[in-house]
Structure formats: structure tokens, C-alpha cells
């Protein structure tokens, strides 16, 4: 686990562009980055979930490749069930038992990966009627405990059980009235539509439509259970680079190291005023929405796109404004790309101005937004519009 934590730490430092020995504070909680986009994160996915997915791949193989040499060795040492799903202690070091323990640990956190393995019944000759999950989401021995207590052949297979016209043929006595009779009727109703076919029973993975196991599905299951709900669903535009998509995500959640955010964390800085306009505190909302110079750039963009300008003071207001525009979803996507590129260039200009870079001219930002957004929309979308068409109005191009 300590190795995994170090790897996660390195992963986080790389994301925040921190040196491995750096003591800089991070404005972004790593768990929020790992969370899925549906939960407001970036869906980087945790190494913890990946590691468990790779572990469980061996459990899947243990069941689906049970005639392989390694599976036979596991059965010879730990029994036919391999101790999977059981609480067990090992008196000697065992990688297999460590994997079993991890599955049990996840189950204690309400993540029962074994439940995702289902039986697809063929001839029913290799599936336990009571011990396997082959009908519904729970074993019959747990769903109908009173009937299981009456069963004289606990390891009876589905084919043998359904071969007789009545399900109580292998019971030591007939079910009596009350709970036993209620469970017996429910069992009959649950299996009466089952039809056996002349093919071998096989295990299927319920998290994939193909029925085949995938590490990615386990990874997603664990992350969805263990990672936090950050905010509303993350907006993502496929036509622009990842780094440009991440930037608006930081704008929305106020994760950027603006002067106001830095001072709020207790760090002493000489100025907290906006480095672009020198008028007002440099907060995220001011830098990208309230700054007068940024507003001038936005006015140029709305004139270019041929619609009216509206005063906005936050990311949330911008989302509402965009959603209320009477444009098709494709054109809204184009406009969203343009704004994402604009915010990216504003942040880049701000950093160059603070850290003394030369050739920082505010007048070039609009030109950079037009050219860069054209390049990404034209070539990353594989569209066919021309540079001249884009210059006239990006909302009139054909994607």
C-alpha cells in the first residue's frame, strides 16, 4: 500500500507540475481529479482501483480457466473454491490469499466484485443450483434459506434439479405451510421460465455488454463507489486538447492559483490586484469575467460571432447564458470551444505578464483565439470549412 501511495503522490505532482521534492501546496484535491466526469471530476482514475482490477483478473481466470495448470495448483493448496469469498487466514505468505483478502476488504466497503460474475446457463450440468448466482442477483441458498435447509443434496446442479417435474424431489420432506410454502412458491415462479440448451454453462461479466471481463469496468466500479461527488457533470469538448479542457474545469471549481487564492491559503504576496487591469482583486471570477480588458475581448468575440453581448460575472452565469442561446448543439459546441481557447490564452497572457516574459501584448489575444480555435476545430474535427469562412463567422461554418 505504501508503494501505491507513493505512486499516487507522484501522479498528483505530475498533474500539478510540481517537482518530486517540491513542498508547494496544491490547489486541487487529487481525489477530485480522479473522480469521474459524471461526478464533476476529470476521470483520471486511481491506481488503487487499477491495481484491484488487475488482481481480480486472476480471480476471473481462476473460474474461467479452471482446467489450467496454475488453477489446479491453487485448488490443490487452497481447496476447490480457492477460498474465494471466504474469510481466511494464511499461516504462510501467499499472493493468492492476499488477492482473496483484498476482495474481502472491498466487500466490507460495499463493493462486492464477485456479484458481477454471473452464470449463463446452457445445459445446467456445471452450475450449482444453490451455491451459484445463476438466476437473479443472489444465490438461492441465501434467498431461500428455509428451502436450502430442507435440501438433502446441497451440491445439486441445475440440470439435475430441473430434470424432475417438482423441485422438492430432493428435499428430505415436503415444504410445510407458512414461510416454507411461500419460499417454495417464489422459487417455482423464479425458475419456471428457465430453458436448458445443449451448450456448456459459462460465466459472464455483468459490467460489460459482451460478457467478457475487463479491468476498466472494475476500475470504474471501485472509483464510482470510493471517489467523492465533486460537483455537476464536467463539461468536455473533444475537439480541443486535454490541457485546454482542464483549464475551464479549474475555472469552474476555483482551483487556479490566482493571487486571491494564494493569499487565502496564508501565503504572503505583495499584491493581490489583477495583473491585467490593475483594478480589483485577482480572483477567478474577476480574471475571466469581470476584468474590463477581458470584457473587451469578449465583446470582439460576440461581434465576430454576430450576437449580442451580455455581462457575465461567473462561470455558472456563462453556462446558463450558453444553454439559453437559440443555437443548435453543434454551434453551441463551436462557441464553447472559442471561449475555452480564450480563457486559456488569458491565463497564458497573465502568467507571462507576472513572470516578466517579453512580447506580452493584450491586443494579440483575440487574434490568437481566432487562429488557434480555427486550427483545432478544422483539423481535430476533420471538418472542411475554410479559413476565410471561419474569419467571417465561426457559427456559419459547416462541421
Language model feature labels by segment:
Residues 1-399:
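A helix-boundary/hinge signal
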Amino acid at each position: 500500500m505504501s508503494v501505491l501511495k507513493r505512486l499516487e503522490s507522484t501522479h498528483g505532482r505530475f498533474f500539478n507540475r510540481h517537482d518530486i521534492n517540491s513542498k508547494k501546496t496544491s490547489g486541487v484535491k487529487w481525489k477530485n481529479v480522479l473522480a469521474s466526469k459524471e461526478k464533476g471530476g476529470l476521470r483520471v482514475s486511481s491506481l488503487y482501483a487499477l491495481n484491484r482490477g488487475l488482481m481480480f483478473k486472476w480471480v476471473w481466470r481462476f473460474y474461467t480457466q479452471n482446467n489450467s495448470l496454475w488453477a489446479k495448483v491453487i485448488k490443490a493448496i487452497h481447496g476447490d473454491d480457492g477460498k474465494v469469498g471466504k474469510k481466511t487466514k494464511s499461516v504462510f505468505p501467499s499472493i493468492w490469499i492476499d488477492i482473496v483478502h483484498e476482495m474481502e476488504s472491498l466487500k466490507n466497503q460495499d463493493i462486492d466484485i464477485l456479484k458481477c460474475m454471473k452464470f449463463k446457463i446452457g445445459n445446467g450440468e456445471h452450475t450449482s443450483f444453490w451455491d451459484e448466482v445463476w438466476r437473479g442477483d443472489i444465490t438461492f441458498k441465501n434467498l431461500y434459506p428455509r428451502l436450502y435447509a430442507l435440501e438433502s443434496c446441497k451440491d445439486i446442479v441445475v440440470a439435475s434439479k430441473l430434470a424432475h417435474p417438482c423441485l422438492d424431489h430432493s428435499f428430505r420432506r415436503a415444504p410445510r405451510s407458512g414461510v416454507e410454502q411461500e419460499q417454495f412458491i417464489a422459487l417455482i415462479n423464479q425458475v419456471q421460465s428457465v430453458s436448458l440448451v445443449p451448450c456448456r454453462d459459462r460465466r459472464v461479466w455483468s459490467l460489460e455488454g459482451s460478457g467478457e471481463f475487463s479491468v476498466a469496468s472494475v476500475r470504474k466500479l471501485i472509483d464510482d463507489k470510493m471517489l467523492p461527488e465533486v460537483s455537476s457533470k464536467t463539461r468536455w469538448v473533444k475537439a480541443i486538447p486535454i490541457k485546454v479542457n482542464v483549464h475551464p474545469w479549474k475555472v469552474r471549481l476555483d482551483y487556479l492559483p490566482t493571487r486571491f487564492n494564494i493569499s487565502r491559503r496564508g501565503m504572503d504576496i505583495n499584491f493581490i490586484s489583477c495583473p491585467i487591469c490593475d483594478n480589483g482583486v485577482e480572483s477567478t471570477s474577476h480574471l475571466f469575467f469581470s476584468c474590463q480588458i477581458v470584457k473587451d475581448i469578449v465583446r470582439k468575440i460576440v461581434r465576430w460571432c454576430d450576437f449580442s453581448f451580455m455581462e457575465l460575472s461567473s462561470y455558472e452565469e456563462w453556462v446558463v447564458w450558453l444553454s439559453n442561446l437559440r443555437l443548435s448543439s453543434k454551434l453551441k459546441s463551436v462557441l464553447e470551444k472559442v471561449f475555452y481557447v480564450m480563457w486559456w490564452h488569458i491565463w497564458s497572457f497573465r502568467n507571462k505578464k507576472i513572470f516578466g516574459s517579453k512580447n506580452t501584448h493584450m491586443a494579440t489575444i483575440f487574434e490568437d483565439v481566432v487562429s488557434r480555435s480555427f486550427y483545432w476545430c478544422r483539423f481535430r474535427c476533420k471538418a472542411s470549412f475554410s479559413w476565410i469562412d471561419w474569419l467571417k463567422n465561426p457559427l456559419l461554418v459547416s462541421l
